[in-house]
Amino acid sequence: MAKERIIGIDLGTTNSVVSIMEGGQPIILENPEGQRTTPSVVAFKNEDIIVGGAAKRQAVTNPNVVISVKSKMGTNEKIDINGKKYTPEQISAEILRYMKKYAEEKVGEKITKAVITVPAYFNDSQRKATKDAGKIAGLDVERIINEPTAAALAYGLEKKDKEEKVLVYDLGGGTFDVSILELADGTFEVLSTSGDNKLGGDNFDTQIINWLIEKIKTESGVDLKNDKMALQRLKDEAEKAKINLSSQLEVEINLPFIAMNENGPVSFSTQFSRTEFDKITKDLVERTSKPVKDALQAAKLSASDIDEVLLVGGSTRIPAVQKIVKELLGKEPNRSINPDEVVAMGAAIQGGVLAGDVTDVLLLDVTPLSLGIETMGGVMTKLIDRNTTIPTEKSQIFSTAVDNQPAVDINVLQGERPMAADNKSLGQFQLTGIKPAPKGTPQIEVTFKIDVNGIVSVIAKDKATNEEKSITISNSGALSDADIEKMIKEAEANAEADEIKRKNIELKHKAESYVAIIESSLTQEGQEIPQEQKEQAEKMVAEVKELIEKEDYEALETKVNELEQMIQMASQFAQAQTAQPEEGNSDSEENK
């Protein structure tokens, strides 16, 4: 029986990617739309769940579209969809399930195992939430690895005979990480990591959106900051402008009928330059400096010690970002890797290592934040320092604070601040049964363990009685094993029906989009279209609407090609209508 392969998934804030080892090399698996990246977007329509590009295209018109859910992982926040509460893990699981399914279709075999990447600066709760999401999606998550580490794996796979110090600058959709690794003889050792979990491409989009809101308000008097539909359109345009400004010095932003004021519909158009973009996002670019310097300091290295700089994440295509990287490190970044795909490829390589398909590769990662407990006076006492290589284990003896104390409360903390209240509490438990004794006499041994996934467990033991209590820190979203199992069973039970629904909803959405295009063309250019063709189009639209209403998807499918022909006809008339005034203007100029 063939050995099961392990896929690598980059579960991103904006986009996600899946990869697998093929012939000793990681390859990217395209989604059903033929794209190598899949938008991390989930849409709910009636009882249907849509993922990826089809979901993203509904973002303007459908209020039940969830984007950037990764930023909510490891929190207690719930997403309300038509009165039903979803956890971030459930939403992420829909993305993972979709990717698992199309990966299976691509490779022609069942897939149950995955390596999933997370930002290096994800805390314990966020890592556990990611594992839970994988479990709900029907995946056994063999390993959670840090995104910059995965990128370095992909970069260094063919360079196992070289010795290099590599800095990975990873600016994604919602998070920013910096990791420094030493590559030597197939060993990838993380020397340090730093980052900012609240900095990414979404922040750059927000700056453009705010700039547009002010411009529109100045020109028309309309304030769009509370108009959800308009804001989604602004976000789409902001993202497009940001991407285009990586290769152009100026772009045009067009927002027809973006709002209404006392004079009627408001349309907005403006030129947006790279200079203006750099100006309004300067503070975001500069925020990346400190984590770079912190990572160098933690690794006890200077910029000149770095041999290669790898850029990861779509946001590193921004020219101002590339400029600051060069200024900080004194060298041009390595451009041999695809910043959107390299993390998933690294995850696939790690999957190959775990499956035994990739040999002579050893990954030594680190914990991004210090771990400890709260002690007398509300102080955080650290047991494991940040940037300690994992897996690891550390013990320390503590005692009681008052005479005859029968129990001790253990508050497990993660962070770098000296006071307990300023750090994240991962969980609390109580060790009871301590024999009566003067304060400071009992010996309580506290042991921290971090596994290869960066997930923490803590044991407290009374040395006198051998009384012991332990806790594996669970996701603060508080999904129990029973909750996860229930979600898995629901997904399995509805898999076939869900697939039929997915195909039908995509067909319906396609038909509705075509109908809207034709109706718009008939309204705007109706007088120019020959009556016979106009009547034919109106009849076709009516038939399609009736099929949609009846949910006759088999018949609807046969109409899609005819609809496409109608759109071509409408497009031709629109182009002709646009060209006529230009010809007229030209004639009038000649006659002057």
Curated annotation (Swiss-Prot):
GO MF annotation, one: unfolded protein binding
Segments of this protein annotated with the region Disordered: 571-592
CDD domains, sorted: ASKHA_NBD_HSP70_DnaK-like
Alphabetized PROSITE patterns for the sequence: HSP70_1, HSP70_2, HSP70_3
Keyword check for Phosphoprotein: yes
SUPFAM superfamilies: Actin-like ATPase domain, Heat shock protein 70kD (HSP70), peptide-binding domain
Ranges annotated as biased composition (Polar residues): 571-580
Pfam families for this protein: HSP70
PTM annotation (Phosphothreonine): residues: 175
Cystine pairs: none
Induction / repression: By stress conditions e.g. heat shock.
Keyword terms of this UniProt record: ATP-binding, Chaperone, Nucleotide-binding, Phosphoprotein, Stress response
Keyword ATP-binding recorded: yes
Domain of life: Bacteria
HAMAP family: DnaK
Protein's job: Acts as a chaperone.
Entry's family note: Belongs to the heat shock protein 70 family.
Protein name in the entry: Chaperone protein DnaK
Source organism: Mesoplasma florum (strain ATCC 33453 / NBRC 100688 / NCTC 11704 / L1)
